[in-house]
Amino acid sequence: MKCQVVLILIVVIFNVCIEAETIKEDKHTLLQFVNNINHSHSLNWSPSLSICTKWTGVTCNSDHSSVDALHLAATGLRGDIELSIIARLSNLRFLILSSNNISGTFPTTLQALKNLTELKLDFNEFSGPLPSDLSSWERLQVLDLSNNRFNGSIPSSIGKLTLLHSLNLAYNKFSGEIPDLHIPGLKLLNLAHNNLTGTVPQSLQRFPLSAFVGNKVLAPVHSSLRKHTKHHNHVVLGIALSVCFAILALLAILLVIIIHNREEQRRSSKDKPSKRRKDSDPNVGEGDNKIVFFEGKNLVFDLEDLLRASAEVLGKGPFGTTYKVDLEDSATIVVKRIKEVSVPQREFEQQIENIGSIKHENVATLRGYFYSKDEKLVVYDYYEHGSLSTLLHGQKGLRDRKRLEWETRLNMVYGTARGVAHIHSQSGGKLVHGNIKSSNIFLNGKGYGCISGTGMATLMHSLPRHAVGYRAPEITDTRKGTQPSDVYSFGILIFEVLTGKSEVANLVRWVNSVVREEWTGEVFDEELLRCTQVEEEMVEMLQVGMVCTARLPEKRPNMIEVVRMVEEIRPEKLASGYRSEVSTGATTTPIGSLSGSPYIL
């Protein structure tokens, strides 16, 4: 028995000695690495400090026996760095070198890291082809090589990385055909903006077209269409018969409606010869003081009801004044009083009705409107949490100010991106928001961003000079905004969220100058710097903002691509979690409590 105890003690002591020796070797390896590279930021990698608790960007495993992760994103690394030294960290699982200026060919020596699960080399200056065989990374789950200058073909050996769930090779110079990658667990794929040709292989046709945009590849054919091709004639015949029956039924319904309407007009002309209904919708009131509602009979009221109600000025903007109105039935709404409408009544009403038809959880629902010669009003829900502008900049500098956490900022940016993407899909894919800014973003009932003010800019005179900080450089008239200019404005919004700066007029120039000097960390809001564990996510969001604010419109992604980029920052939460929490098309339910929030149109 005593011999067994002694033997166990010897084994334990032996293992402890081995572990101590491993972490000692890892420390020596990283000191050798940092002494052989060019970097503009000072790393506190000192031999006298604990590698596991004090070294910036270094994370050890649970028992501090070896280095588990290197997070060196945006640390000013530059030039052709010898990464073979890092390959000695045999237990390394995470290697993040994003947003530096590292050049040279793909570091093949990293293939010695058999335990690697995440490799991010995005936003660097790597060039040349990838190795033909990448199968040594059997445990790899995330591979991001986007925004470099890699060329050649995409290795088919990537298909052997069976645990891979995220692959991003976008914005490189890859050419040739897309390999057939049979990876069942692959959830995120981005091959956009390369020089790829041919067709999308069947194994990848489950991904959206945005994953392949910017290449010369044929769009994937939906599997259900391929399945039923041999029954084409039967399908066509069935459709033709269905259409004929539908047309006959529609004609019958129209005939009944026409006869019914004529009878109604006769009765109406007898009873009220001087009155005329504006619309057949039951929510549209008669007379000059009625507000037109798109839905919800419980909200029907007229101008006199508004004048009697208790109102509070929430904000004044270049388009008019916004009021919080408490109605007699305890309902609270937001009424925006619009000034300087530059279009005739018919065009105004047509645009407003288009906006009112939009139903999406990340787009503020337009409830109704009023138009007369002297007064133009629009009615929205009241969001008690307030606008993103208030949450970011309100009470700044005060001790009792509640900090806006990164989680909330990320959710608001993501929700807003989804909202703008949905807006861009309306009116045949031609609708433009035209006035994206932080005072038009609110928290919806699920705590995600919800955008208001859709399409209003096209109805007004051009914005004054002091209010055009979000405007894309190619836009000289805000009434003629485009979807790419919306993307630019969204990029400014991202910068505002990351920097916490309320003055956005020169924000793009300032952010680019700071990043160019390789001081990316200086960009971020001081309130965010306390959250060191999310610095990598903030850097990735910064990259999205920089792509969105490209000076040339054709260089900017569309909003569907932007949504995917933001999802990839935290895929397990955003890409899947949002859809499980929020059902598509659900209406917004205002939550929270924050008085005096500026709703500025």
Curated annotation (Swiss-Prot):
GO cellular component: plasma membrane
MF terms (GO), sorted A to Z: ATP binding; protein kinase activity
Binding site for ATP: 314-322, 336
Keyword Transferase tagged: no
Membrane topology: Single-pass membrane protein
Record-annotated membrane-spanning stretches: 239-259
UniProt keyword Repeat present: yes
Lineage: superkingdom: Eukaryota
Extent of the signal sequence: 1-20
Classification via InterPro entries: At_inactive_RLKs, Kinase-like_dom_sf, Leu-rich_rpt, LRR_dom_sf, LRR_N_plant-typ, Prot_kinase_dom, Ser-Thr/Tyr_kinase_cat_dom
Phosphoserine: residues bearing it: 310, 387
Cell compartments where the protein resides: Membrane
LRR repeat residue numbers: 91-114, 115-136, 139-161, 163-184, 185-206
Domain Protein kinase: 308-569
Keywords per UniProt: ATP-binding, Leucine-rich repeat, Membrane, Nucleotide-binding, Phosphoprotein, Receptor, Repeat, Signal, Transmembrane, Transmembrane helix
Phosphothreonine carried by residues: 408, 478, 549
Pfam families: LRR_1, LRRNT_2, PK_Tyr_Ser-Thr
Family affiliation: Belongs to the protein kinase superfamily.
Free-text comment on this protein's domains from its UniProt entry: The protein kinase domain is predicted to be catalytically inactive.
Record's protein name: Probable inactive receptor kinase At5g53320
